[in-house]
Amino acid sequence: MIFIPTNGTTFLLLDGQPAVFSAVAQKLYALNTEAALIWCGFEEGEPASSVVDRLVASGVSPTDAATYVNQAARKWVRLGLLQVHIASFDGLATECAFTVSLGRSTWTFEFNGESVAQSVLQLFEHHEPPLESGNRLKIIEAKGLVYVFDNDRCVLTCAMDDVVPSIKAYLTEQLVSQCAPDIAFHAACLEHNAKALLISGDPGAGKTTLALYLVQHGRLACCADDIVLIRSDGTVTGVPFAPTIKSGAWRILEEFIPDLEDVPVHRRPDGKRVKYLNALAMVRNGSVYPVGGIVFLRRRSRGDAKLVPLRRLDVLKRVITGSYSPNRRMSHASLIAFKNMLTQADLFELSYSNVAEAGAAILGMYDGKS
């Protein structure tokens, strides 16, 4: 394996004391003599086996040298000081590839193994043959770990159990950072009669659970369960990841989605267990709709479901709080987009304790509407 320093990482000597500084973490790490030898070997592009030989030449036993190099590499990768170089996998052929469209961007995935590809496909309902243009991720499984390269730069190293949630988290981060001129809004997006219904709320408020209930019990189609892109004219488009279902909602949803029981379980970076439902007949990427309604969820431990109308100014504040732009600032153009989005929308807060009652309250908004 070949490791190289990450961008912004610098080796230095201070009064003879070797150290490494990370500009990203804003931390300084002191190194002992053996660690300094190991670091310099990696910095010079040597493979791990050659770094072990360098340590042995300094007087360390072969067994100890191999242990030191392995432990140092793992620790420095975890700290973000080192990254795996793609040259470590020269000679590995691409066995399968596909492209997905997310918002305004396309992502092509290349794999050296079919099993990882099938796991990652759980994130998407629609995919196409690989394209030559657009963003490209190379996903390599080796010795029980999965390495993800974006433009030949290692951006993720994780276990097989973590690869699907980790890739979704990375893609989400990239989509938000590249979404200009659109604005990313944290909400589920459903389509009814060529208009969008946005369902927003704090983490754990039940956006995905309620959205899936509405899809199964109403005439609504799912566009997205967590990311909506707001365009300059106020129309929106959902980012069509397969809905992420947390473990607390499995029992509720299995009552009307029986196949959910057989969907594989994944572990997110935050430790939560999730399933991805990619058999929902989701709206295809790029479908754009005016917003017909926005519902903000307020989950309670008890009490009947209740819809309360909201003023547009109050909703604007909430939308600003739940939105993200590449420069992390809302501009005049952003405010105009929000205003355009809210102009013709029905705006409510929904307090509820029972998903079925909440779903009935929202479906009641459409009674009498075609």
Regions found by a protein language model. Give the residues of each.
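Charged, amphipathic alpha-helical linker segments immediately N-terminal to NTP-binding catalytic cores
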Residues: 126, 130-176, 364-369
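Conserved lysine of the Walker
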Residues: 207
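Transition-metal
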Residues: 85-142
